[in-house]
Amino acid sequence: MSKLTKKQKKIAEVIKPNQLYTVADAVAILKQFASKKFRESLDISINLGVDPRKSDQVVRSSTNLPKGTGKTVRVAVFAQGDNAAKATAAGADIVGFEDLADKIKAGEMNFDVVIATPDAMRIVGQLGQILGPRGLMPNPKVGTVTTNVEAAVNDAKSGQVRYRTDKNGIIHCTVGKADFAPEDVLENVVALINDLKKAKPASSKGQYLKKISLSTTMGPGLPIDISSIPV
């Protein structure tokens, strides 16, 4: 059996088995173990009471986090004419049409979010094998296929997170950085859960929010007391 590292020993001393934490307490503990070399993200995992094998129980949506993610987001927009001008004015990093598709096919992927107007989907659809596996394919359900490109760019830049249940019925997303104030993280978590409740499939029965855990990029995951979240 391998020996525990100094960090692992400290984690074992601080984190109590089978204990549930408030968001504030979890953030305070995770801050202790966060890297000093880079800003670690605070990530949340929420186990939902859905059957992801059923198409009508797949939860896919987006949330505008009131306190943002702490990350600089690069946005690419497929649009032309007035919509292209609006996207550029809103702060999109890359705007194009067929030329943007050619860049992506050539391997230029310097962006985190892709937005497209409906008329651009005939072009974007050809990029499914490139964008899809990276979670970048525009989708109307999360607001990335839209005629209102200005609002979509603003949302993406200001802290919108997109999520979809995985094969185990769990959604994963970022709710801030390890150096965020606990109250800011809580505000983001509340916004996320409220949106998840609105997105609950009608066919989902029983307990919907089953388990929640909070972790940093390189740190442990802490189970959260759902009843302590004011939603």
From Swiss-Prot:
Membrane-spanning ranges: none
GO biological-process terms attached to the record: regulation of translation; translation
Record keyword Iron-sulfur present: no
GO molecular function, one term: structural constituent of ribosome
InterPro entries: Ribosom_uL1_bac-type (IPR005878), Ribosomal_uL1 (IPR002143), Ribosomal_uL1-like (IPR023674), Ribosomal_uL1/biogenesis (IPR028364), Ribosomal_uL1_3-a/b-sand (IPR016095), Ribosomal_uL1_CS (IPR023673)
Entry keywords, A to Z: Repressor, Ribonucleoprotein, Ribosomal protein, RNA-binding, rRNA-binding, Translation regulation, tRNA-binding
Record's keyword annotation contains Nucleotide-binding: no
A GO CC annotation given for this chain: cytosolic large ribosomal subunit
A Pfam family per the record: Ribosomal_L1
PROSITE patterns associated with the record: RIBOSOMAL_L1 (PS01199)
Subunit field text: Part of the 50S ribosomal subunit.
Alphabetized HAMAP family for the sequence: Ribosomal_uL1_B
PANTHER family: 54S RIBOSOMAL PROTEIN L1, MITOCHONDRIAL, LARGE RIBOSOMAL SUBUNIT PROTEIN UL1M
Role: Binds directly to 23S rRNA. The L1 stalk is quite mobile in the ribosome, and is involved in E site tRNA release. Protein L1 is also a translational repressor protein, it controls the translation of the L11 operon by binding to its mRNA.
Family of the protein in this entry: Belongs to the universal ribosomal protein uL1 family.
Annotated protein name in UniProt: Large ribosomal subunit protein uL1
Species in which this protein is naturally found: Legionella pneumophila subsp. pneumophila (strain Philadelphia 1 / ATCC 33152 / DSM 7513)
Gene for this chain: rplA
